[in-house]
Amino acid sequence: MKIAIIGAGIVGATGAYQLSKNKEVELVVYDDGVGQATKAAAGIISPWLSQRRNKDWYRLTARGASYYPELMAQLEEDGVTQLPYEQVGALVFKKTPELLGKLEKIATERRKEEERIGTLTKIEAEKISSYVPGWNGTHGAIHCSGGGRVDGKLLVEQQLFLAKQNGASVQQEKVSLTRDEEGKVVVKTNSGLEQFDKIIVASGAWVKELIEPLGYYVDVRPQKGQLIELELETTEEKGEWPVCMLHGEIDILPFADGKIIVGATHENDQGFDLKDSQELQQKMYEEACEVFPVLKQAKWLGSRIGTRAYTSDFLPFFGSIPEENSIFVASGLGSSGLTSGVWIGALLAQLSVDDTPLFDVDSYHPKNYIQKLI
């Protein structure tokens, strides 16, 4: 069976890694690498403390979070020594004790069904510094020991490397979809038209430009996201700290080597723009410094900028598109893409060779977001 994957972000790379283990599959991966959300992302894996009301979103992200240890075990078995994911715990901050209590109640209830949450501890503002030395915020937090962090760029690179080792072809090329003389969907490459038994479109916010020329409407929009990278150079300030989710849009992700990731922006009016916004980056930096003053001494390493994909109801979709059973698609993962994307990628790999899903996928079917035009 010959399968193409278009897009090598978190979904495409995970799908490629899983499919490359199947010796009956001839796999080709296409990705031009421009604007990819995953390569720009370092993320917090801790969906259990989210207060989003959408149960389908929670079910998917919780399953994605629980898949990470399994995926890391696979990478380790295949020789990876620097794992991109680590369980370091997460601190989730709230403005008032009442909101903190509400969050604790939600998390405690969810822990009855999800052991991966780990230990939950409510921490007063003045005690946060025992978890993150130098912390100077005025809000309390819930500490979730099961929370983790992942370097999206490293995770993608490692999975693509292993896929190539397993025989997959990875092409750095921008491709499109079209129909041949018989009406079959084919991949248009720089060297001509390529036919495949199955095609997986995992191109994030760019899914519209690939699918709509085939005669469909796609409910996906782009959102620009910016992160900043800092580095603490003083040895005493480095440590294995939990990731920190502030009550606004800002997260702080400390790494053991002294690197600190701060972000991210959620810009709905910038389309596919990938330029630095010094004003927004400075605002994020100042907000982070208010609660973590040691960042004022940090070296500014640069920024990461990518484009996320969102649907109108903020729920991801994945599966085969209407009336095209050989074409699979995934998009709309938004800012929780690193959490749900590994599981979606694994599911698409499985669905492309076997119609029996490992997970109830009906709520995420593309038919809810992709309509055939008459």
Predicted regions and their residues:
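Dinucleotide-binding Rossmann-like beta1-alpha1 core, especially the glycine-rich loop
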Residues: I44-K127, E287-C289
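Short beta-strand to alpha-helix junction loop
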Residues: R59-R63, F93-G101, I142-Q158, K275-L280, ...
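Core beta-strand elements of the Rossmann-like FAD/NAD(P) dinucleotide-binding domain
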Residues: T189-K198
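C-terminal catalytic lobe of FAD-dependent flavoproteins
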Residues: V294-I374
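Beta1/beta-strand and adjacent pyrophosphate-binding region of the FAD-binding site
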Residues: M1-G9
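Helix-loop-beta segment of a Rossmann-like dinucleotide-binding subdomain
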Residues: T81-V92, E109, T119-N166, T265-Q270, ...
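Active-site substrate-recognition segment that forms the wall
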Residues: A4, T14-K21, Y30-D32, G43-I44, ...
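A conserved short coil-to-beta-strand element within the FAD-binding core of flavoproteins
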Residues: G148, S169-V185
